[in-house]
Amino acid sequence: MEDLNEANFSHLLINLSNNKDIDAQYASTLSVVHELLSAINFKIFNINKKSKKNSKSIEQHPVVHHAASAGREFNRR
């Protein structure tokens, strides 16, 4: 069996849930599964978008660390 990509799987769920020859409860379950997958994909999309935005921000404004020499401590009083 070939791997199903996301679009094909979504299309399959929609077609099966709209099929008049299957049990209504089964069709409802398929619709719920489709909605859950859509919600998960939306969350993943937003996380990826936020991650890309953060990585671009870091590239534009690199963090500079000022380290003390080994064995020396700062007196911060």
UniProtKB/Swiss-Prot annotation:
It comes from the Viruses. InterPro entries: Chordopox_A30L. Signal peptide: none annotated. Phosphorylated by viral OPG054 kinase. Residues 53-77 are annotated as: Disordered. Interacts with protein OPG092; the interaction stabilizes both proteins. Interacts with protein OPG062. Belongs to the orthopoxvirus OPG157 family. Required for the association between the dense viroplasm and the viral membranes to form the mature virion (MV). This is Protein OPG157. It comes from Variola virus (isolate Human/India/Ind3/1967).
